[in-house]
Amino acid sequence: MEYTFFSVVMAMRIELTVRDQEDMKALATTLSKRLFPGFVLCLEGDLGAGKTTFTKYLGKGMGITDTINSPTFTILKIYEHDLPLYHMDVYRLDGIGADYDLEEYIYADGVCVIEWYHHIYDSLPDDKLIIDIAIRGATERHLTIEGTGLYEDIVKALDR
């Protein structure tokens, strides 16, 4: 007799509406207090949805004073701090991209924020926090936040 084994990854998922940048800042600041070495945050959303804005607020919440801007053309920006921030924009990549060695940062002891994460999904750890940002108006955004493993409790804490 043969047996087939499979695993199911369970995730905690919530949906939130942020009315403006102040709400976005409050959410990112709350999240910044729960970061740990090896934290992986995946961001998805249309152009202009607020992925980089969220990352700026997250960095400020971490105490980073450098200007945080989009790494669209550089792929990766590193902000050194007590807990380093590795900010990636992988929109232009298909797969991990051998020239960039991004896995070195994804699995490092800092905080890794990845915009357009679906382009390198197969290179990501099973446990991660995913935030999908949808535009609902000039300033309003609908966020779907999903976490697996260690990130499930963080999702619960963000459910305000």
Where in this protein do the model-derived segments appear?
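Walker A (P-loop) phosphate-binding loop of P-loop NTPases
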Residues: 48
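Hydrophobic anchor at the beta1->P-loop junction of P-loop NTPases
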Residues: 41-43
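Conserved nucleotide-sensing/catalytic segment adjacent to the nucleotide-binding pocket
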Residues: 78-118
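Conserved lysine of the Walker
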Residues: 51
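Short beta-strand-centered segment that lines the nucleotide-binding/catalytic pocket of NTP-utilizing
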Residues: 64-79
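N-terminal pre-Walker A segment at the start of P-loop NTPase domains
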Residues: 11-28
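Short phosphate-coordinating micro-motif centered on Lys-Gly-acidic
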Residues: 14, 60, 105-160
